[in-house]
């Protein structure tokens, strides 16, 4: 499967800046190539619950209704195990959600679009792009 899996920080930017860099980039590619992970959706919904903002939740739900949210499934578990072991052996562990998102992208052969390139660049074989490039 070719395409792009949008990370939490990228979707958050789309919510804050609907006409920003990410939206512009999406406008230049096939929108069917865009998706996100259920882990990202969970992080976004957690952020809304923590803020207690119905308005923000409505914006998140509206965007997630447009962007396909992919379920986490086999073979992401095998990818997760390999990635986690490799990073821990190297003394460079990352957060649990980041691991799941990376494993999801790797398992599906997707490029992870993230502003968190410092963390995700440690993962061998994970294709990453930063559409925010600050």
Language-model-detected regions and their locations in the chain:
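Active-site neighborhoods of divalent-metal-dependent phosphate/nucleic-acid chemistry enzymes
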Residues: 2, 58, 67-115
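Generic structural signal for small/hydrophobic residues in well-ordered secondary structure
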Residues: 7-8, 22, 44, 80, ...
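Nucleotide phosphate-binding site architecture
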Residues: 11-12, 42-45, 70, 121, ...
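Short, well-structured N-terminal submotif of metal-dependent ribonuclease cores
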Residues: 1-36, 46-62, 89, 134
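Flexible glycine-rich beta->alpha loop in the catalytic core of nucleotide-sugar glycosyltransferases
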Residues: 20, 111, 118
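Alpha-helix capping/helix-boundary segments
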Residues: 10-11, 40, 76, 101, ...
């Amino acid at each position: 499967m070719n395409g792009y899996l949008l990370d939490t920080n990228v979707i958050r930017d789309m919510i804050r800046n609907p006409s920003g860099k990410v939206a512009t980039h999406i406008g230049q590619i096939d929108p069917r190539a865009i998706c996100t992970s259920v882990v990202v959706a969970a992080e976004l919904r957690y952020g809304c619950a923590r803020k207690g903002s119905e308005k923000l939740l409505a914006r998140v739900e509206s965007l997630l209704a447009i962007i396909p949210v992919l379920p986490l499934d086999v073979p992401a578990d095998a990818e997760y195990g390999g990635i986690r072991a490799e990073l821990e052996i190297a003394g460079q562990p990352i957060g649990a959600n980041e691991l799941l998102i990376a494993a999801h992208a790797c398992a599906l052969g997707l490029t992870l679009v993230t502003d968190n390139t410092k963390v995700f660049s440690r993962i061998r074989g994970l294709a990453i792009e930063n559409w925010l490039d600050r």
